[in-house]
């Protein structure tokens, strides 16, 4: 007795997508875990409370802090090649990327997952409602802001918008 199995195109496509997901999911999860265990080095002012709150946000989202330098961040930002126009109150180095300012952990995770050809990402200034600038003192206020992807040539474009 012979049994014939016939797959429609739709069923074959669903099977292919499900198979690809099953094969790729462990690799993506391992890649994300590896990114999160990459140490983070931070430069900030010793008395800056919002920087400390941003660090807590990053740690709560799985990032490991290797070193905190309470010496300010202007010299570190310049040494790492990030223009002052992208500046904020703290600068971090995560893997090979500069992370400037109150960047959400989700944006950093995306940066590490996608690995774009870039110097890093930045949230210039100190937008209210961004991580570290979102405490009770701000009364729930949330300003719109953008996380910028900064290229090595100094140009940038919007990496992620937040409202």
Listing of model-derived features with the role each one plays in the protein:
Residues 65-76, 86, 94:
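Thiol-based oxidoreductase modules, predominantly thioredoxin-like and allied folds used
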Residues 36-53:
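Local sequence-structure signature of Cys/Sec-based thiol-disulfide redox active-site neighborhoods
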Residues 56-67:
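Iron-sulfur (Fe-S) cluster-binding segments and ferredoxin-like electron-carrier domains
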Residues 79, 85-163:
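Thiol/selenol-based redox catalytic cores and closely related redox-interacting motifs
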Residues 30-34:
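Boundary at the C-terminal end of the N-terminal hydrophobic targeting segment
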Residues 47, 54, 69-72, 104-108:
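Stable alpha-helical elements in mature extracytoplasmic
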Residues 2-20:
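N-terminal secretory signal peptides and thylakoid transit peptides that target proteins
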């Amino acid at each position: 007795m012979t049994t014939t199995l016939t797959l429609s195109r739709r069923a074959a496509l669903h099977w292919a997508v499900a198979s690809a997901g099953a094969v790729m999911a462990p690799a993506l999860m391992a890649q994300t875990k590896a990114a999160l265990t990459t140490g983070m080095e931070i430069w900030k002012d010793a008395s800056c409370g919002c920087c400390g709150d941003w660090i807590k946000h990053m740690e709560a989202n799985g990032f490991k802090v290797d070193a905190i330098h309470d010496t300010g961040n202007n010299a570190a930002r310049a040494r790492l090649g990030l223009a002052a126009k992208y500046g904020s109150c703290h600068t971090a180095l995560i893997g090979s990327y500069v992370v400037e300012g109150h960047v959400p952990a989700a944006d950093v995770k995306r940066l590490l997952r996608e690995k774009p050809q870039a110097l890093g990402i930045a949230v210039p200034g100190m937008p209210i409602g961004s991580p570290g600038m979102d405490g009770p003192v701000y009364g729930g206020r949330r300003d719109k802001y953008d996380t910028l992807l900064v290229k090595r040539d100094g140009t940038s474009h919007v990496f992620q918008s937040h409202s």
